[in-house]
């Protein structure tokens, strides 16, 4: 496996073949499933003292930061590990897995070049530790950068994923176009309302959250760090 062969790893296209623990960007998937399982998600409230406590272990926020009282927008913007591990602990793992697979985890990706499938590792046998770790982007779940870019693009496109392509057009020596790639809809990953709500959360990240360095940009920024 070239992915695990350090001597040849320079040959790997890390954008599509890299298998990485996602980190806090996975909170997008956790948030989407929480929204689907809890129609009153806008009433979410959590008090963060810097640590969430579970039986036999605890999960801390970055640098032990205590975020105080948070709604779901605040928890997402602050990337609050305490809030999201608590959210994850309350999710139905079967539904959580389905949401991840709706977003093409454990599925083929619409790519015409070599890639590695992203893996959502939770199932009915998973422990509380595994579930809470996964909900904050740690644990055994892995994803490629290209796959997360597809999810972000679908959120921007009202839930619809377009088929990625590399070559836009082919021109001859006279600069005449001899072949033009046509845009193709691949799949609807989420509803337009879900995408709209996730954009609101991602806007908060770049307005006052962990990505607030973008707050004064001369364009509207959405993100998750």
For the regions a protein language model found, what residue spans apply to each?
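Beta-lactam-recognizing serine transpeptidase/beta-lactamase-like catalytic domain environment
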Residues: 1-24, 29-225
